[in-house]
Regions:
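Sec/Tat signal peptide C-region and signal peptidase I cleavage site
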Residues: 30-33
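Extracellular glycoside hydrolase catalytic/binding regions
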Residues: 38, 199-348, 352-370
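Bacterial N-terminal signal peptides that target proteins for export
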Residues: 2-18
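Extended, alpha-helix-rich binding/interface surfaces that flank or overlap catalytic cores
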Residues: 332, 336-414
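Active-site mouth of glycoside hydrolases
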Residues: 41-47, 53-56, 60-260, 265-273
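Active-site beta-strand termini and strand-to-loop segments that position acidic
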Residues: 48-49, 278
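Bacterial N-terminal signal peptides
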Residues: 16-27
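Outer-membrane beta-barrel biogenesis signature
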Residues: 35-38, 50
């Protein structure tokens, strides 16, 4: 039996969970009626509290808390900070701040969560930007004001009530763990070079784990998204990855013995050669693959890793190709008992997502301005009207459901 299995009596009491949350000033307490039904690693499987195999069928909530340029049709403003700066120029800083509050409120709602569950998914993976969870004064721009905590709390509650599991994914770590736009860093993986960034990353995970240690809706903690791009100094950086993972896990385990820790390989999550013998009894390993042939050859190294170390493996991001490929690839994963999380749930004017935001009239003007410094900005009043139309279009009641996409994953439109 796994060391964190409930039969070993290691679940915190309901009163103890509440007391710890309040003592730490976390502002969040787990449900007092929650059952000890954590997902945990058991050999090559993930299992629930009853010992039944849990195969992840997940979707990524991309663009919600970590905006990406291509999901707005921007070619130049690509990172979250670049996108934020563009909106400051487009409609002014004050209106831009109001835009982001509304954006986060409408992009993922309880209706979206219920739809995801009804379609047949059992998991959502939520990318986080550390800036949204930083202490006051710790984040250089001071613009985010720890806005992420109530949003994540709310999502977890919705998922618990809907019967979905949540993978918490640190998509943009302090300093940037990847060296590309979606880690919101300077273009190089400074998480590994700057001691302050490293310590902030460890401290954030400890705080997340302390807050959610008794929350059964959370499946696990995806410690770093796609660390160390192949463009970086991989000979130096790759050996640093598992060392950082060990330190993060030690911090997590000091407050949370319940949740699975999810470890991604280097170079877009593909390279498992950076790993040695597993160092935590409740760990799973996750890889990312896009646009590969849907054959066993593409999975073999991960199957070998799983067999060698007797650990669970699943794919944390994939998709954005076509529906025929989706069908073949998800079936291939399931054939070998591997879970999956496709990317993304919602996108703008796309057939390659679960739902699509209908492009508002005039959005091409915004997209052009976000794609070239030479493109003129629309007049502010016009830009504000277009942005408001986008927010309305992003609401669940107004999106287009991509039934063929959902069907290609072996699921169905409710």
């Amino acid at each position: 039996m796994n060391a964190v299995d409930g039969t070993h009596g290691r679940w915190p009491s309901q009163l103890g969970a509440l007391t710890l949350a309040l003592a730490l000033g976390l502002g969040y307490a787990p449900p007092l009626a929650a059952s000890p039904d954590f997902i945990h690693a058991d050999g090559k499987r993930l299992v629930d509290g009853r010992g039944e195999t849990f195969v992840i069928k997940g979707i990524n909530l991309g663009n919600w808390l970590v905006p990406e340029g291509y999901m707005f049709k921007f070619k130049q403003a690509r990172s979250p900070s670049e996108i934020a700066g563009f909106f400051d120029s487009l409609i002014g800083p004050e209106d831009a701040s109001r835009f982001w509050v509304k954006f986060r409120d409408v992009y993922i709602t309880e209706e979206d969560v219920r739809f995801i569950k009804a379609a047949g998914f059992n998991t959502v993976r939520v990318p986080l930007n550390w800036r949204l969870f930083a202490e006051p004064g710790d984040e250089p721009s001071h613009r985010y004001q720890a806005a992420g905590w109530p949003l994540l709390d709310r999502l977890v509650q919705w998922c618990r009530e809907a019967g979905l599991r949540v993978i918490v994914d640190l998509h943009a770590a302090p300093g940037g763990q990847t060296g590309v736009n979606h880690d919101d860093g300077p273009g190089y993986p400074l998480t590994f070079y700057v001691p302050q960034n490293r310590q902030r990353t460890i401290a954030l995970w400890q705080k997340l784990a302390a807050r959610y240690h008794a929350e059964t809706a959370i499946l696990g903690y995806d410690l770093l998204n796609e660390p160390i791009s192949p463009y970086s100094d991989v000979e130096y950086l790759n050996p640093q990855l598992e060392r950082l993972y060990r330190d993060i896990v030690a911090a997590i385990r000091s407050v949370d013995q319940n949740h699975v820790v999810l470890l991604e390989g280097a170079q877009w999550g593909t390279n498992f050669a950076v790993f040695h013998q597993p160092f935590d009894a409740n760990a799973a390993y996750t890889y990312h693959k896009f646009w590969i042939n849907p054959t066993r050859d593409g999975l073999q190294s991960y199957l070998d890793f799983s067999n060698r170390w007797n650990v669970p493996v699943f794919i944390g991001e994939t998709g954005e190709f076509n529906n025929s490929w989706n069908d073949k690839f998800h079936r291939l994963q399931e054939r070998f008992g591997l879970g999956w999380c496709f990317w993304p749930y919602k996108n703008l004017d796309s057939d390659l997502s679960v739902v699509s935001i209908q492009k508002p009239v005039g959005w091409d003007l915004i997209a052009e301005a976000g794609s070239s410094a030479k493109a003129p900005l629309p007049a502010r009043a016009q830009a504000q009207a277009i942005v408001n139309a986008y927010l309305e279009a992003a609401k669940f009641k107004n999106v287009r459901v991509n039934a063929d996409y959902i069907n290609s994953l072996g699921l169905s439109v409710p």
